[in-house]
């Protein structure tokens, strides 16, 4: 996350399990009034979200922002497609990279920065099943080492 960033609202842990995140970009979100209120309340889910470049614009799909509790009949659609704000050169770079086989644009986290909702968008390459198993083995080994050090400290 860039320096000076604010409060993290939601993280996409599944993205780190399913993909190698090679680069991340900070993108602004085009939101409606009730959507930002729901985000500030922490009612957002990035689990199945993905982004696509279409006509020189980046759009995020399947990002679920729950309806605002105190909203009236003008409440938003929870799964609507939302536009992301990026610089033109970043969009061109993402468009070229996402056309390559095996690459995807995945939302990594949503956070508030200076009162505005921002999204960390990752350029990701899919993991194979054996990569996932290897990561789990490494994680378990680190846990075992930490546990051994803790037990040794107690003695």
Swiss-Prot record:
Keyword Hydrolase included in the entry's annotation: no
Gene Ontology terms: cellular component: cytosol
Pfam family, one: SmpB
Compartments where found: Cytoplasm
GO molecular function: RNA binding
Gene Ontology biological process terms, A to Z: trans-translation
This protein's record includes keyword RNA-binding: yes
Signal sequence range: none
Keywords on record: Cytoplasm, RNA-binding
InterPro entries: SmpB, SsrA-bd_prot, SsrA-bd_prot_CS
Role noted for this protein: Required for rescue of stalled ribosomes mediated by trans-translation. Binds to transfer-messenger RNA (tmRNA), required for stable association of tmRNA with ribosomes. tmRNA and SmpB together mimic tRNA shape, replacing the anticodon stem-loop with SmpB. tmRNA is encoded by the ssrA gene; the 2 termini fold to resemble tRNA(Ala) and it encodes a 'tag peptide', a short internal open reading frame. During trans-translation Ala-aminoacylated tmRNA acts like a tRNA, entering the A-site of stalled ribosomes, displacing the stalled mRNA.
UniProt xrefs under NCBIfam families: PRK05422.1 (NF003843), smpB (TIGR00086)
Similarity section: Belongs to the SmpB family.
Name of the protein in its database record: SsrA-binding protein
Protein's organism: Bacillus anthracis
Chain's gene name: smpB
């Amino acid at each position: 996350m860039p320096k000076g960033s604010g409060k993290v609202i939601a993280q996409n842990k599944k993205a780190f399990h399913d993909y190698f995140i090679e680069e991340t970009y900070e993108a602004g979100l085009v939101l409606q009034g009730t959507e930002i209120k729901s985000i500030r309340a922490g009612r957002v889910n990035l689990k199945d979200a993905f982004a696509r470049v279409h006509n020189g614009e980046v759009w995020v799909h399947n990002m679920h922002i729950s309806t605002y509790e105190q909203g009236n009949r003008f409440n938003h659609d929870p799964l609507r497609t939302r536009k992301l704000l990026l610089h033109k050169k970043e969009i061109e770079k993402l468009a070229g990279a996402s056309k390559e086989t095996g690459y995807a644009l995945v939302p990594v986290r949503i956070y508030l920065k200076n009162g505005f909702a921002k999204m960390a968008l990752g350029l990701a390459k899919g993991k194979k099943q054996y990569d996932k198993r290897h990561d789990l083995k490494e994680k378990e080994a680190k846990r075992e080492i930490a546990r051994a050090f803790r037990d040794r400290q107690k003695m």
